[in-house]
């Protein structure tokens, strides 16, 4: 099965594009440092572009819903990846997006203390 022609044309233009690994590394270090300083337990990434963060009460689905409803923060519960009790946060986003997410993570964490 071949991908549609439009997809093939788009991929052809992207063939030489390389990810900005230095930016991803900076985001990883920032997110890990800030979340652990807030009191979150994080599993250090070992080559992936996402960070697993343990939710304080173990209910990753409820945490994700609360983050969206109370702080307009979209996070992925790791139950979707057969790893309940964690969030799976991708850090291959803009540095600004990481910075804008931190106050919400801080506010949510404070509610658990």
Where are these regions (language model features)?
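PLP-dependent class I/II
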Residues: 1-113
């Amino acid at each position: 099965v071949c991908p549609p022609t439009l997809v093939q044309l788009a991929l052809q233009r992207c063939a030489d594009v390389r990810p900005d690994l230095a930016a991803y590394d900076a985001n990883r270090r920032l997110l890990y440092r800030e979340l652990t300083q807030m009191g979150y337990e994080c599993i250090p990434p070992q080559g992936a572009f996402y960070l697993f963060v343990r939710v304080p009460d173990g209910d990753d689905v409820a945490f994700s819903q609360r983050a969206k409803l109370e702080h307009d923060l979209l996070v992925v519960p790791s139950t979707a990846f057969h790893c309940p009790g964690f969030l799976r946060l991708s850090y291959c986003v803009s540095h600004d997006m990481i910075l804008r997410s931190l106050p919400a993570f801080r506010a949510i964490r404070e509610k658990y203390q």
